[in-house]
Amino acid sequence: MAVPDQKSPNVLLQNLCCRILGKGEADVAQQFQYAVRVIGSNFAPTVERDEFLVTEKIKKEFVRQRREADGALFSELHRKLQSQGVLKNRWSILYLLLSLSEDPRKQPNKTSSFAALFAQALPRDAHSTPYYYARPQSLPLSYQDRNVQCAQNAASIGSSGISSIGMYALNGPTPQSIIQGQSNQTPNMGDALRQQLGSRLAWTLAAGQQPSQQSTTTKGLPNTVSRNVPRTRREGDSSGSVEITETSLVRDLLYVFQGIDGKFVKMCNSENCYKVDGKVAVSKSLKDITSKLSELGWLHNKIKKYTDQRSLDRAFGLVGQSFCAALHQELKEYYRLLSVLHSQLQVEDDQGVNLGVESSLTLRRLLVWTFDPKIRLKTLAALVDHCQGRKGGELASAVHAYTKTGDPYMRSLVQHILGLVAYPILNFLYRWIYDGELEDTYHEFFVASDPVVKTDRLWHDKYSLRKSMIPSFMTMDQSRKVLLIGKSINFLHQVCHDQTPASKAMAVGKSAESPKDAAELFTDLENAFQTKIDAAYFDTSKYLLDVLNKNYNLLEHMQAMRRYLLLGQGDFIRHLMDLLKPELVRPATTLYQHNLTGILETAVRATNAQFDNPEILKRLDVRLLEVSPGDTGWDVFSLDYHVDGPIATVFTRECMSHYLRVFNFLWRAKRMEYILTDIWKGHMCNAKLLKGMPELSGVLHQCHILASEMVHFIHQMQYYITFEVLECSWDELWNKVLKAQDLDHIIAAHDVFLDTIISRCLLDSESRALLNQLRAVFDQIIEFQNAQDALYRAALEELQQRLQFEERKKERESEGEWGVTAAEEDVENKRIQEFQESIPKMRSQLRILTHFYQGIVQQFLVLLTTSTDESLRFLSFRLDFNEHYKAREPRLRVSMGTRGRRSFHV
């Protein structure tokens, strides 16, 4: 005999009885049996607060009463109730309605019921407490013959002394009462039933005597035989095969629902569907219903296959795993229904009797029970198909696309799944916008980070948007703000070295805890979620701009660029040119940067630039460009402004190269103005001196006319560059900077400013022809300066010699001598004649110079009139306000005339 386990419940219960009564094991046998009966029973009904099970009970009641239409209507109303979310305790209301539906006029005779129960003695040697089947997660994978198992269980009662307890769901389907007296039981099942009645006391107390139970008669057994016993084929059939029953198909379908082949219903790989075995005979109606029901198994397999494959794929990411978890959760609810259906069949199998036609599970009733699950599985299968090959935000977008449906039941299901799928995305998002941390191992978030990028390019290149991963329930503006928030936090920490906690930097100091409800991503995009994003965006951006302006003087550096690199500080630029002129006229190869730097510092100290911030002045420097053969200092000189740290994010290398190009252009234009000023000074100073040389009047008149044309041209160009280009663009930039909400707005406004002045200063690729003509004009001005300087040198030298000759002549005459000898007079006349003979050469040189200059200006005007920029076309009017060049150039007459007619028609 086996030694009993000292820790088993049976031994412990017997020891407890002995300890309480103070007697031996033999003396407490009666009390021990009573204790077993008490534990095996449940005197208080156990009501589990499960809305699903209460709903299924109500549906079963409709089916039992043959009110399938009312059952379908109840399912639809219940779905609407779930989608509205008005009631919080739906279970309580449903349970109340179920209780009220019982007929109060037919109270069960509890006394007779209890008498019938207690008339059945408990087994004498019961050594185990009853086990109640509590909603398994899935059905058994093996297919067993329930009738054989039931017979074995009944036979084991007498041999082992342990009662075989039927397996019921605590709140599962209510089986028909089998406590109708001994006359209703078949002789071969009576002993087994008597052994089981005591352990089901709790169920009987909870369920009571239903009206259907009181009316149950001995008609149950014939029904059982008719449903379970196979029927032979009709006489007209040629084969002698046996036609399978509806009950067998129901049993098979419960396994097919889980993707397991049954005895008669199996997967057909060629057609990819479940079919009834062709070797067995089934009526057409049953085969059609079986085909409809077996679709659940195919849908189940499709979903299960997807979850099994993706659950093992770690690269699928958190969003994908959440999607799989949502599918698992739906399958779990599906398995719960199968458990209820399975327990309904087990009632009949374990007891060995049928519950009657009204409570039996038929294929048609199975259709009603699986109507809602089939809709859910179809929706899930469609989601699985649509989400193939997607991950992260793209997967969330695919799920979100299915929420745009008019079916409230389907929309509620997909929204629930979307809430689970969007949960990791919301975690990523909150971690990013409140802490600046990006923990995206599997690249699921729509913000991407490049670890190779260094700190100096953090703002521009390190973080970017993965457009394919932006969820469809988020707008591009929201995504851009999310990117800017986290980028600003990282910029503050890594570039500005500002370690201010996020809670202090932002008014909304939300921690990075997991959000309670991810559904706000798609249900309240314009209110709560938008408010959070906007609050974090405005606070973070404002704090970043405050740090840049107060700690790093961003606006002052921007103004310094305008004053020095764009020649806005007029007194400084003029004085610098005066100081640099002796150095810059030399060949470029003879210049030394330290000499030019010293001159720059002198110009700063002598002008209003000395009052600027020392932080700005120390960044101002001299830069020499690459030297080409024949270059002078004017061609290679440039001012430079050193930028580093956070301000280098705004003034990037590309921006500084643009500033350098603009400075060289403005510097050359300013030099032309400087040259023409010197030419005008030469005219004013030498006009009286050369009055005594009438032969030069024609040449000087030519010089004055050409100089006036050049001065007019340069003045109009300077006006255009200074006011229409620089000042207007700068004013627009400054207004944008003051109104900027984030650093990107400042960078964008600054880039637009540079692009505008590059374009309007003719430095872009589209204006290359105009720039070449303008440089040719500048070259002609320099040539004119050289020609006039040569003319004045020759004229002044000749004037000096004439004055010296006259002075010597007067001295000799005062001494009483001849003023001049014949030889000296011949030499003087010869020299004067040679000078006079050189004047036509000078005049022709000036005429050629004038011709070239006017030709270049005319070509420049033609290009201006055909330009697409309206400001450049207006510039052509000012350059030729008196139509001087228009009279000389036919193309100008055509272009301007056409333009005039166009403006007239407009």
From Swiss-Prot:
Its main location: cytoplasm. The keyword Cell membrane does not apply. InterPro entries: GCP, GCP_C, GCP_C_sf, GCP_N. Necessary for the recruitment of gamma-tubulin to the centrosome and for the formation of a functional centrosome. Pfam families: GCP_C_terminal, GCP_N_terminal. Residues 208-229 have a biased composition (Polar residues). GO terms for cellular component: centrosome; cytoplasm; gamma-tubulin complex; microtubule; spindle pole. This is Gamma-tubulin complex component 3 homolog. Belongs to the TUBGCP family. It comes from Xenopus laevis. It comes from the Eukaryota. Interacts with gamma-tubulin. Gene3D superfamilies: Gamma-tubulin complex, C-terminal domain. GO terms for biological process: cytoplasmic microtubule organization; meiotic cell cycle; microtubule nucleation; mitotic cell cycle; spindle assembly. Keywords: Cytoplasm, Cytoskeleton, Microtubule. The gene is tubgcp3. The keyword Cytoplasm applies. One of its GO terms (molecular function) is gamma-tubulin binding. It is found in: Cytoplasm, Cytoskeleton, Microtubule organizing center, Centrosome. Residues 208-242 are annotated as: Disordered.
